[in-house]
């Protein structure tokens, strides 16, 4: 690229957007250059094959002088956006919890190897982070969480999450714990409804929120709050609540990492008003970056109307991998990767 055409060195902004397909359109390139944009979240619709995905992430990173953060929901089980052309079929996190009940040491090993395979494959294709692990407790009632949760015991959840994050870290990938302070106790799906959890703050902190306090920002460089209302604590969903984000998560639990909002287009976010009101509420509560997914019209509306609020730039930058990852062919020949896949296969089949 010639010097005159080099993208401007904008710091990351507080809005994460998405793209429609497998290649960037000119309109999307323009959107990514907006100073309020700080990241891009990918979905299954953005994947045709590994070569195409790698080209797409290269184009996204090249859109700005300081590359945007590229993220994806790639947890394993039913929430795994890329499943073909060599990507490993990752187990649902409940599988790790079931292994724990038989053999805790084997479960810890499986969690680390799963995290490593997950992250190594994503990074080989240019994806910077996955919004994982899910720290919600498995109460057996939540429709949207289900087998995405490790276990019902918060101590087991914390141990398995820590092991999974260790695997991510082996590749240079940051983790994101979700959905603070806990989405597992309510049946409603916040994508389509507004869940309400009527428990007391003491009960939530003792169980659901405990892993966040135990792990902290050294293990979880980022956290995503739930679009769930806890009326005994605040009338607003956690992601829009200064009580939850600033006072409890950051103040009481001492958390100093990045806080992402969940998708502002979800039904659970509708209580805060229009897209601008939702973003303002999340940022005012203490979130560092807000997600606007599947509605480019709302993303553009927000980018046009949101007054610039300097984001926690240093926090956000810490989520970017510090070093380059091996490409796919090099990864396939890597002995650590081969070992991790063998461990996964042996433990799950056994």
Swiss-Prot record:
GO MF terms held by the record: beta-N-acetylhexosaminidase activity
Keywords for the protein's UniProt record, in alphabetical order: Cell cycle, Cell division, Cell shape, Cell wall biogenesis/degradation, Cytoplasm, Glycosidase, Hydrolase, Peptidoglycan synthesis
Residues annotated as catalytic: 191, 262
Top-rank lineage group of the source organism: Bacteria
Pathway: Cell wall biogenesis; peptidoglycan recycling
A matching Pfam family: Glyco_hydro_3
Enzyme class label: hydrolase
SUPFAM superfamilies cross-referenced by the UniProt entry: (Trans)glycosidases
EC number of this enzyme: 3.2.1.52
Positions that bind substrate: 73, 81, 148, 178-179
Its job: Plays a role in peptidoglycan recycling by cleaving the terminal beta-1,4-linked N-acetylglucosamine (GlcNAc) from peptide-linked peptidoglycan fragments, giving rise to free GlcNAc, anhydro-N-acetylmuramic acid and anhydro-N-acetylmuramic acid-linked peptides.
HAMAP family per UniProt: NagZ (MF_00364)
Name of the protein described by the UniProt record: Beta-hexosaminidase
Organism field: Bordetella avium (strain 197N)
Gene name per UniProt: nagZ
């Amino acid at each position: 690229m010639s010097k005159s055409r080099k993208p401007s060195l904008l710091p990351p902004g507080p809005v994460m957007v998405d793209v429609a397909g497998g290649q960037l359109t000119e309109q999307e390139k323009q959107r990514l250059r907006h100073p309020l944009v700080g990241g891009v979240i990918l979905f299954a619709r953005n994947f045709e094959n590994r070569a195409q995905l790698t080209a797409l992430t290269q184009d996204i990173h090249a859109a700005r002088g300081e590359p945007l953060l590229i993220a994806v929901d790639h947890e394993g089980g039913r929430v795994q956006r890329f499943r073909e052309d060599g990507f490993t079929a990752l187990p649902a996190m409940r599988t790790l919890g079931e292994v724990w009940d038989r053999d805790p040491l084997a479960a810890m090993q499986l969690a680390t190897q799963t995290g490593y395979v997950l992250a190594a494959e994503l990074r080989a294709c240019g994806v910077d982070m996955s919004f994982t692990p899910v720290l919600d407790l498995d109460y057996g009632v939540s429709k949207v969480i289900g087998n995405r949760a490790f276990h019902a015991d918060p101590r087991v959840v914390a141990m398995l999450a820590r092991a999974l994050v260790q695997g991510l870290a082996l590749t240079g990938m940051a983790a994101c714990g979700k959905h603070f302070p806990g989405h597992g106790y309510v049946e409603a799906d916040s994508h389509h409804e507004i869940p309400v959890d009527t428990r007391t703050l003491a009960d939530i902190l003792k169980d659901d929120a405990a892993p966040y306090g135990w792990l902290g920002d050294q293990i979880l460089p980022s956290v995503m709050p739930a679009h769930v209302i806890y009326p005994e604590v605040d009338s607003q969903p956690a992601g829009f609540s200064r009580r939850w984000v600033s006072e409890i998560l950051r103040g009481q639990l001492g958390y100093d990492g990045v806080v992402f909002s969940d998708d502002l287009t979800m039904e659970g976010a509708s209580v805060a008003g229009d897209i601008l009101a939702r973003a303002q509420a999340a940022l005012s509560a203490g979130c560092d970056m807000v997600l606007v997914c599947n509605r480019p019209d709302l993303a553009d509306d927000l980018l046009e109307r949101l007054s610039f609020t300097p984001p926690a730039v240093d926090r956000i930058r810490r989520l970017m991998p510090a070093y380059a990852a091996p490409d796919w062919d090099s990864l396939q020949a890597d002995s650590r990767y081969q070992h991790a896949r063998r461990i996964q296969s042996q433990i799950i089949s056994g």
